[in-house]
Amino acid sequence: MTTEQEFEKVELTADGGVIKTILKKGDEGEENIPKKGNEVTVHYVGKLESTGKVFDSSFDRNVPFKFHLEQGEVIKGWDICVSSMRKNEKCLVRIESMYGYGDEGCGESIPGNSVLLFEIELLSFREAKKSIYDYTDEEKVQSAFDIKEEGNEFFKKNEINEAIVKYKEALDFFIHTEEWDDQILLDKKKNIEISCNLNLATCYNKNKDYPKAIDHASKVLKIDKNNVKALYKLGVANMYFGFLEEAKENLYKAASLNPNNLDIRNSYELCVNKLKEARKKDKLTFGGMFDKGPLYEEKKNSAN
């Protein structure tokens, strides 16, 4: 932790309970000061003033800490301090126990009535994400569409895991839509759901996560039982997961609906060949097991 030298010191409360020493000034301008409700991202080290012992550090975890400002998610002294900071500012803040963990403390590492010292660096902040429950139906559809398009951009760059996150995020907007009665919005919702689930099936097939590919392709077929792309992706996932009979059925139906699609036809032929090989192997393994009579046959001339 940085040693206190001749730095600017600011009393953030009238009683001196929260005192901030600025170690590195932040960016100028009002736009660089976080507001109530913003999601802030910080790095910090916390120690006890009495012993100098470090009890917590985001650096040790190598992961910055995020919280929503003035929402009761952290101790009061933190809300007061970080509210006064600017982006890229680094400070040392002294927090009396009434603004920290009080006379109860916090576990074994922070005894009651402890004065706390934190070195905090404000890395960034942004407006908190709006709750899905606060969106109008129109906003849900538009947001889901926009996020799906972001997923498509990741997919084009072959950033498959990033694309998966976006497609799933888009679908989250439709978790509670049972009471929708606007047919235009329902049709748009259906198209986005089909598109996202198809894309997720493709992504999971690429990642060889066949159970998840099966799940998302099946969701499309619940909406549109003759969706050729879903049948194809489901067939491919079933085939590579070892469900050859199901795969053959999926791919046969897809080929029947779209007989000119070479990818479907080639996958169907591959599946048929895999099925033949599997049956041949089964025959070699089990074919002669029972053709010599019962496993335990009495000897003809056994003694009574």
UniProtKB/Swiss-Prot annotation:
Variant or mutagenesis effect after changing residue 152 to A: Severe loss of binding to a HSP90 C-terminus peptide (MEEVD)
Effect after changing residue 233 to A: Severe loss of binding to a HSP90 C-terminus peptide (MEEVD)
Could you give a single Gene Ontology term from the biological process aspect? Answer: protein peptidyl-prolyl isomerization
Report domain PPIase FKBP-type positions. Answer: 37-126
- Activity regulation summary: Inhibited by FK506 and its derivates, such as ascomycin, and rapamycin. FK506 and rapamycin inhibit peptidylprolyl isomerase activity but not chaperone activity. Inhibited by N-(2-ethyl-phenyl)-2-(3H-imidazao [4, 5-b] pyridin-2-yl-sulfanyl)-acetamide (D44). Not inhibited by cyclosporin A. Inhibition of calcineurin phosphatase activity is enhanced by FK506.
Effect in UniProt of substituting residue 199 to A:
Severe loss of binding to a HSP90 C-terminus peptide (MEEVD)
Classification via SUPFAM superfamilies: FKBP-like, TPR-like
Q: Tell me which UniProt keywords the record has, alphabetically.
A: Chaperone, Cytoplasm, Isomerase, Nucleus, Repeat, Rotamase, TPR repeat
A GO CC annotation given for this chain: nucleus
The record's subcellular location field reads: Cytoplasm; Nucleus
Principal location: cytoplasm
InterPro entries named among the record's database cross-references: FKBP4/5/8-like (IPR050754), PPIase_dom_sf (IPR046357), PPIase_FKBP_dom (IPR001179), TPR-like_helical_dom_sf (IPR011990), TPR_rpt (IPR019734)
> Which PROSITE patterns has this protein been placed in?
FKBP_PPIASE, TPR, TPR_REGION
Task: Say which domain of life the source belongs to.
Answer: Eukaryota
Any single Pfam family the record assigns to this protein = FKBP_C
Entry's Gene Ontology molecular function annotations = FK506 binding; peptidyl-prolyl cis-trans isomerase activity; protein dimerization activity
The text the record gives for the protein's domains is: The PPIase FKBP-type domain contributes to the chaperone activity. Required for the inhibition of calcineurin phosphatase activity. The TPR repeats are important for the chaperone activity. In another study, these repeats appear to be dispensable for chaperone activity. Dispensable for PPIase activity. Dispensable for the inhibition of calcineurin phosphatase activity.
Family of the protein in this entry: Belongs to the FKBP-type PPIase family.
Q: How does it assemble?
A: Homodimer. Interacts (via TPR repeats) with HSP90 (probably via MEEVD motif).
* The protein, known as: Peptidyl-prolyl cis-trans isomerase FKBP35
UniProt source species: Plasmodium falciparum (isolate 3D7)
Which gene is this protein's source? Answer: FKBP35
